[in-house]
């Protein structure tokens, strides 16, 4: 898997007949912007750099057939209007619109029930560290309640749920037709098994690390 910060022109002949997949690891920057005081200019720079890289690959290998998006139900018919929430002048929106206008189909990779359950598990795990939650549980269940065991159980269920989501997503990705290209927008760190024989390019421009550091610094205060 190639990780692209700077673009170095690959030998097109070595990739010509394979399926090509451009993976964009991201975080919900737009949603986190207010909470973590993320400058919108940094978000725009991130998506602008992504647009440049995708544009390069399109010019080298041809148009993209599918744009796979995390957070959209697999059976849902999603259009460009889904991305209007980011603003029509945003690089995020312009990236998707350019791909869609060139014939790419926007496709979800998740099941709603899996997304909801995964979110519930993560929230429950995070809350288990709050003293107020521990006290509330002890008031009802007694002082002997074992929060470490509870967290171990939650971690186990989180892993099981992620494994199920991984298999489901990998199955959808594997349906990408031969000799075609796809884009995947997915949360950084989410596991995905890519099919053998597929050329996978990880697009992670410098702006990503800058924003991620911004978030970590604020969380560590």
Question: Where on the chain are the PLM-derived regions?
Answer:
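Compositional signal for N-terminal targeting/processing segments
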Residues: 1-221
């Amino acid at each position: 898997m190639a990780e692209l910060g700077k673009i170095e022109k690959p030998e097109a002949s070595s990739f010509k007949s394979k399926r090509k997949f451009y993976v964009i690891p991201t975080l919900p920057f737009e949603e986190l912007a207010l909470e973590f005081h993320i400058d919108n200019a940094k978000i725009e720079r991130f998506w602008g750099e992504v647009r440049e890289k995708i544009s390069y690959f399109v010019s080298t290998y041809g148009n993209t057939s599918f744009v796979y998006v995390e957070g959209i139900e697999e059976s849902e018919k999603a259009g460009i209007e889904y991305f209007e929430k980011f603003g029509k002048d945003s690089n995020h929106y312009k990236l998707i619109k350019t791909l869609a206008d060139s014939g790419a189909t926007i496709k979800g990779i998740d099941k709603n029930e899996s997304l909801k359950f995964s979110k519930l598990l993560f929230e429950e795990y995070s809350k288990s560290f709050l003293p107020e939650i521990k006290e509330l549980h002890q008031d009802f269940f007694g002082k002997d309640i074992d929060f470490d065991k509870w967290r171990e159980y939650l971690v186990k269920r989180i892993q099981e749920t992620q494994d199920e989501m991984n298999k489901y997503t990998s199955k959808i990705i594997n349906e990408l037709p031969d000799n075609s290209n796809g884009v995947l927008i997915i949360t950084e760190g989410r596991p995905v098994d890519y099919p053998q024989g597929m050329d996978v390019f990880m697009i992670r421009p410098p702006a990503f690390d800058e924003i991620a550091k911004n978030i970590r610094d604020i969380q560590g205060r």
